[in-house]
Amino acid sequence: MYEFDWSSIVPSLPYLLDGLVITLKITVTAVVIGILWGTMLAVMRLSSFAPVAWFAKAYVNVFRSIPLVMVLLWFYLIVPGFLQNVLGLSPKNDIRLISAMVAFSMFEAAYYSEIIRAGIQSISRGQSSAALALGMTHWQSMKLIILPQAFRAMVPLLLTQGIVLFQDTSLVYVLSLADFFRTASTIGERDGTQVEMILFAGFVYFVISLSASLLVSYLKRRTA
């Protein structure tokens, strides 16, 4: 019968916390940039100017049709060359974390865009017409009238997508980036406690995701 050995967890906590910080950095960065870029894409897709709408639609369709792990690898290969040529960074600089942040931000923006677009379309067109009648421009009505109402209703959905993003960050193992999951796995391989460390990592992901889910449920009740 297998005997669990949890003794390596406590001594490894500093390394695990460092890995968790990297995971949270990727998550927070991708959520913030993803929502900002996703909002722009949503507005562009609703534009009456066809080329702009086509670009936004093509962007969303492309990123939603490609596996995330492939996007991570693409940006891992593209971003270093871009930064070296534009910013003059040395090839020796480790920019795996930046590559991961860019990849997740661009990928998640496609999903946030659809959430935000649906939120905008849920607002009565009468409000936009009333704003235009008062002398506001289209962009002013979008900024001051439509988006604030749409975001209030969308907060639970945006946070839910953020939870999915947090769980997906474990895929950065393909970049050999020492996030929380990879750190736990590496420690398990080193100490011969692979099962225990993976179970512990899963428990931490569960606790954080459950806490965030409870927050989402609370916000849903508040915004209902």
From Swiss-Prot:
Disulfide bridges in this chain: none
Keyword annotations of the record: Amino-acid transport, Cell inner membrane, Cell membrane, Membrane, Transmembrane, Transmembrane helix, Transport
Bilayer disposition of the protein: Multi-pass membrane protein
GO cellular component: ATP-binding cassette (ABC) transporter complex, substrate-binding subunit-containing; membrane; plasma membrane
Coiled-coil ranges from the UniProt annotation: none
Main location: membrane
Signal sequence interval, chain numbering: none
UniProt-listed InterPro entries: AA_ABC_transptr_permease_3TM, ArtM/GltK/GlnP/TcyL/YhdX-like, MetI-like, MetI-like_sf
Pfam families named among the record's database cross-references: BPD_transp_1 (PF00528)
Cited Gene3D superfamilies: MetI-like
Topological region Cytoplasmic: 41-67, 113-154, 218-224
Disruption phenotype: Disruption confers resistance to cellular contact-dependent growth inhibition (CDI) CdiA of P.luminescens strain TTO1, but not to several other tested CdiA toxins.
Subunit structure: The complex is composed of two ATP-binding proteins (GltL), two transmembrane proteins (GltJ and GltK) and a solute-binding protein (GltI).
Function text: Part of the ABC transporter complex GltIJKL involved in glutamate and aspartate uptake. Probably responsible for the translocation of the substrate across the membrane.
Protein name per its UniProtKB record: Glutamate/aspartate import permease protein GltK
Species this protein is from: Escherichia coli (strain K12)
